[in-house]
Structures are given as structure tokens and as C-alpha cells.
Amino acid sequence: MKTLTSQGIRTYGRLLQATKQYWPIFLIGVVGMIAVSLSDAGFTWLIKPIINRGFIARDLVFIRWLPFIIVLVFLFRGAANFLSTYFINRVARNIVMDFRRAIFSHLLRLPAEFYDRHSSGHLLSTVIYNVEQVAQASSDALIITLQASSLVVGLLVVMFLVSWKLTLFFLVITPLIAWVMRVCSARLRHLSTSVQKSVGEVTHIASEAIEAYKIVRLYGGQKYENEKFRHATKLNQQRELKVVVTNSVGTSLVQLLIAIPIAIVLFFATQPSFHVTAGSFASIVSAMIMMLRPVRRLTMVNSYIQKGIAAAESIFKLLDEDVEKDRGERHLVRARGAIEYQGVSFAYDNSKKTILSEISFSIEPGQMVAIVGRSGAGKSTLINLLPRFYDASTGVIKIDDINIKEFRLQELRNQFGLVSQHTTLFNDTILNNIAYGQAGSIDKRKIIEAARAAHAMEFIEQLPEGLDTVIGENGVRLSGGQRQRIAIARALFKNAPIHILDEATSSLDTHSERHIQAALDNLMDQCTTLVIAHRLSTIERADWIMVLEEGRLIEKGTHQQLLTLNGAYAELYRMQFAEKPAAMTALDE
């Protein structure tokens, strides 16, 4: 338990350290909270003279001033309460904003293998849910802790001033209260961590089903997804209820422990041998009863703090993840486009299986090279090593005769354009999607040229808002072919010296494909192009073709040379084109 507690203290200390820039604002809120507590405690002290001097002694001067005193006390309390609530919550919302920005910025710099290990649902849960838990720990918990504890201290001072003997009875149960809170604290921390994991699972299942809604419906997966979601939400509900039970039991025990000394005080105060004025008795009993609420709130704040610490631990764990290694110092404005692989092998971390083995080849600037092979042969992995989404396990990759690890990472990636069969677009305008990531002012004329070259202007001009049309999440408002043409226009606009085409025309109709292929041919004349090919008819004019099988480069040559070789490529070619005549025959019949 001590280890858990010390870890929690370190986490909370790191949380406070991360928010130290807001301490001046925070101190204003603290002063306001203390002022609120002092005014509440002061009002219980006023009960003694109100009864003794107002109702018993009938002090007319005191009675005359009493209404003004009460109004002033509550005016003071109202102003102090505004200061405390506003400034503490301002700090909390700033913390939420800062953490979300820090997490998002960090996520954009994490390596590809991190995303291989984590689902998007769990990451979204950290950004949204866990950060809010930290906000509660830094606002609600701090407000309650400081305000309630200062009120308890103020009430104890009032009780000592009124009757120190009666107050001692009350203090006897303090160690028991501390023990109950400590036991509840350990359990709440454990439960809070499990609740956050269950929320991440709920988010993951929901986001996955929403993104794949077409597949879910086409394959009748509604029942299966519903069962998964029901199970995840049930688990989350059970864990949340365990938190509620633990919190409620702890609060009830603390209230019971406080009620016992109140009963004892009432018993002794009413004994004839115990001399106490009516005002003193009313004041001390009022203080004791008033203390029930802040003590109850202090036991509840334990739940907030434990949730906040558990959430902060997950946030700091994410922020402590190593970002992509970028030790390169060479500048690379625009590459010529020469590419060389020298004995490159690759295996994922903690995996014994080799994905690529001893791959060697070189590409001259301006060449078009196709990569073919069966599914799982390593085609995509081979390409992913080039912009350093992954680093080769052994061997060297060069661009323009220089090891790619020597270049600054972003400058290296600026040399590539990508058009994939799995098109990625953003919930933004067509114009911003085409010009995505390009710094500086956007030249609309060049965007139109790129869109026209990609044959995208044909449908863009028919849209009411043209290039300013917002296309929805991943371009949901466009057809598959239209989305693909936007992606091609984006690559044309970037005009990078090296282009990666992953079956770039797969979503286009035959008419559009001819025009796009012509545009891509013009682009290939000016840059080096790597084509991951599934349809072999699209790569017959490649300068040369490499064939991968189980991570090894087994054949290399032009289309005609590989057909003459009558090896793996020729077999793939015959398989594809044997289907085409059969399909045409069926159509003729």
C-alpha cells in the first residue's frame, strides 16, 4: 500500500508541476476559498452572542447592528465564493486544454509501431475521458479539499474558543476517520484504473463499429457488435458501481464516527454539573453539525483524487512514450530521386518472424519501378521503410547516395507523394484536402491545375460550392472514384520528387482511368515512381519490375523479360489474364 501511495504522491506532484504556470491564478482562488470557509466558521461563532446578547441579555445596540453584520458577512462570502469558483475552474479548464494539446501533439510524433500496439478507441479515451478526470482532480477536488478543510479548521477553532473540553471529545475519532479514508483510497485507486480501461474498451468497440458500418450491415454483424458493446458497457457499469459502493460506505462510516462524539457532547452539555451558556452550547453544536457536510465532502473528494491520479498516470505514461527518432542533421530541399536498398532486412520488435530478408536494388532518378507479389509478401513493408515509418533491422537505404537516417525526418518525408487504394481524406474543403500540409499561402490556380490534371474538376465544378465544398469524414459525401481523384490531385499538387502509388487508379471507371493514367504518366516523367501493383496490366510499361515472395526479392526485370523467364511473375500474369477472357466470354453469352 505504501508503494501505491508514494506513486500516487509522485504522480500528483508531477501534475502540479505541469500546472505551475497557473499558480498565481490558483492562489487567488485559494484565498477566495479560505475566505468562504472563514465566513462560514465566523457565522457559527456569531450564534453565541446572538443568543446570549440578543435573546437573553437583550442588548439593544447589538440587536440594532446585527442585521447589517449578517448582510456584510454574506456579501463578503458571495464575493469570495465567486473568486474561488471562477479562478479554480479557469485553472482546471486551462489544464484540460494544455493536456489535450500536449497529448495530440505527442500522438502526431509517435512512431508507427506505437499505433500497431494501441487501438484508436483507447487513445481517444485518454484524450477525452482521462483528461476530464484530471480536471476533476484539479478543480472539484481542490475546491472541496481546500474549502472543506479550511472550514473544518475554522470550525475547530470556534469550538476551542467556545469550549475546549467539549471539543476534545470530538477529536478522539480523528484517527479512525483517517484510517477509513486510507482504506477507501487504496481501493478507489484500483477501481478508477479499471474504470478507465473499461471506458477505453467501450470507446474502441463503438468507434470500430461506426467506422465499419457498411461491413457490419452487409455481413449481418449487428447482433455480434451489439453483444460486444453490451458486454463492454456492462463491465463498465459494474466497475462504476463498485466505485459508488466504496465511496458511499466510506462516507457513511465517517458520518457515523462524527455522530458519536456529537451525541456524547449533547449528553455532557446537558448535565447540571457541566456549566455552559445557552449561546456557547448552540454555537458548538452548530459547529459540529456544520462540520458534517465538509467532512462528508472530504470523503467524497477522495474518489475524485483517486480517479484523477489514475487518469494522470495513464496520461503521463502516454506522454513518456518515445517519439520517432530523428537524429539526422542533413538538409534535403529536393532529392534527385535515386533510391538504393543494400542488404535490407526487417522484423517487427519482439517478433522472431522476418518480414523482409536481404533486399538489394537501386533505382535511377525518374524511373518507374513496380513491386508485385502475393498478399503478405512484404510489398507495403518495403515501401514503409523508405519514409522511415519503420527503420530497417539491418542494411542501409539511400536516397541520392546518402543514408536516409542522415536526413532530417520531416525533410525526408517531404520528398514523397502518396496515392493509395485506401484513400484518406479529411473533413474539410476540397481545396484544403488538395493543398493538405503545404506551408505558406495556397496558390488556388495551381490547385485548379492539379485538380484538372487529375480529372477532378469535372465533378468539382458541378458542386454548389466548388473547391470550398466540405466533403465530410474521409470524403463520405463523394463517390469512391471522386475520392481517389482528390487524392491524386493532392499528389500532383505536392509535386514531390518520389511518388508511391498503391494501385492508384483502382477505384476509377475505365473512362476516368485512361485520363488519370495519362496524368500520372506526365508526373512519372518528372519523378521517381514506386508502384505497388495488384493489377499487372497497369505496370507493363514500368522501367523494371521486382517480384517479392515471403520477404525475398526473387525476380527482377522488365515486363517482357519476366514473362520470358517464365517464373513467379509469369505465373501471376497468366492467373490474372486467364480470368479476363473467361469473363468476356460470359458477357458475350
Swiss-Prot record:
One GO term (biological process): transmembrane transport
Catalysed reactions, semicolon-separated: ATP + H2O + lipid A-core oligosaccharideSide 1 = ADP + phosphate + lipid A-core oligosaccharideSide 2
Annotated EC: 7.5.2.6
Cellular component, GO, one term: plasma membrane
A molecular function (GO) term: ATP hydrolysis activity
Keywords: ATP-binding, Cell inner membrane, Cell membrane, Lipid transport, Membrane, Nucleotide-binding, Translocase, Transmembrane, Transmembrane helix, Transport
Subcellular location: Cell inner membrane
UniProt-listed Pfam families: ABC_membrane (PF00664), ABC_tran (PF00005)
Binding site for ATP: G373, R374, S375, G376, A377, G378, K379, S380
InterPro entries: AAA+_ATPase (IPR003593), ABC1_TM_dom (IPR011527), ABC1_TM_sf (IPR036640), ABC_transporter-like_ATP-bd (IPR003439), ABC_transporter-like_CS (IPR017871), ABC_transpr_lipidA (IPR011917), P-loop_NTPase (IPR027417), Type_1_exporter (IPR039421)
Family to which this protein belongs: Belongs to the ABC transporter superfamily. Lipid exporter (TC 3.A.1.106) family.
Domain notes: In MsbA the ATP-binding domain (NBD) and the transmembrane domain (TMD) are fused.
Subunit and interaction comment: Homodimer.
NCBIfam families: MsbA_lipidA
Protein role: Involved in lipopolysaccharide (LPS) biosynthesis. Translocates lipid A-core from the inner to the outer leaflet of the inner membrane. Transmembrane domains (TMD) form a pore in the inner membrane and the ATP-binding domain (NBD) is responsible for energy generation.
Stated name of the protein: ATP-dependent lipid A-core flippase
Species name: Coxiella burnetii (strain RSA 493 / Nine Mile phase I)
Gene designation per UniProt: msbA
